[in-house]
C-alpha cells in the first residue's frame, strides 16, 4: 500500500490572497504526488529510538523512498520524539509495518535487498543500485541478527567506512548516506 498515512493530525494550510492555492498547499500537493513515486525501500528491522525513525520518516518523504518497519518497535508511532523529529512530513511518507522479517520478505518478492551493517563486506559506494532496490538496517543497539545478515551473499552486505576503532554511526545518518548514494546512482530521478 503506497502512502499509508501515519496517525498524526493533518497540518493546517494557508490559502493565497486570491483564494487559490497558497504556497504551503502547493508544496503539500507536490509532496503527495511525489509520494506515489517509489524508488527505494528503507527497511528498519526492530528500530528502537524514536528520533532516529522520525528523521528517517522525513528523509523518506523527501526522497520518495518507502519506509518499512519490522516489529517489535521500541516505541509507539504516536511518540512525541518521533513526531518532533519528523516535523510535518509524517503524512507524506509512504510507510508500512510488518509483523516480522518473513512478512516483510513476502512483500519484497523479486526485489534486491542490501543489508547494511558494521559487519558488511562491501563498501556501500561500490554497490550498484537500481530503482526498486531495498536497503535493510538493524536496530540501533545491536545491528542485524547474524542469521539475517548471513542469509545475504557478500555482495549484498554493505558497510559505511569509519576510522579504526569506531563502533557505529547513528542509524538515521547511515540511512541518509546510503540512500543518497543509491539515489545519486540513478541520477537523482524526480529531484528538483
Model region roles, listed by residue range:
Residues 14, 27-192:
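Post-transcriptional modification and biogenesis factors for structured RNAs
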Residues 1-36:
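Intrinsic disorder/low-complexity segments
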Amino acid at each position: 500500500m503506497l502512502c499509508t498515512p501515519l496517525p498524526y493530525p493533518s497540518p493546517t494550510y494557508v490559502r493565497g490572497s486570491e483564494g487559490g492555492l497558497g504556497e504551503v498547499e502547493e508544496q503539500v500537493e507536490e509532496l503527495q504526488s511525489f509520494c506515489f513515486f517509489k524508488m527505494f525501500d528503507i527497511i528498519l528491522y526492530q528500530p528502537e529510538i524514536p528520533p532516529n525513525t522520525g528523521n528517517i520518516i522525513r528523509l523518506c518523504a523527501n526522497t520518495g523512498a518507502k519506509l518499512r518497519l519490522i516489529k517489535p518497535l521500541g516505541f509507539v508511532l504516536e511518540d512525541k520524539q518521533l513526531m518532533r523529529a519528523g516535523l510535518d512530513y509524517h503524512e507524506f511518507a509512504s510507510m508500512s509495518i510488518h509483523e516480522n522479517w518473513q512478512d516483510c520478505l513476502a512483500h519484497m518478492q523479486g526485489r534486491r535487498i542490501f543489508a547494511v551493517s558494521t559487519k558488511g563486506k562491501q563498501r556501500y559506494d561500490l554497490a550498484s543500485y537500481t530503482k526498486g532496490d531495498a536497503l535493510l538496517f538493524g536496530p540501533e543497539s545491536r545491528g542485524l541478527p547474524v542469521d539475517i545478515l548471513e542469509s545475504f551473499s557478500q555482495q549484498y552486505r554493505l558497510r559505511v567506512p569509519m576510522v579504526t576503532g569506531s563502533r557505529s554511526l547513528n542509524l538515521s545518518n547511515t540511512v541518509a548516506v546510503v540512500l543518497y548514494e543509491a539515489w545519486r546512482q540513478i541520477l537523482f530521478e524526480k529531484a528538483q
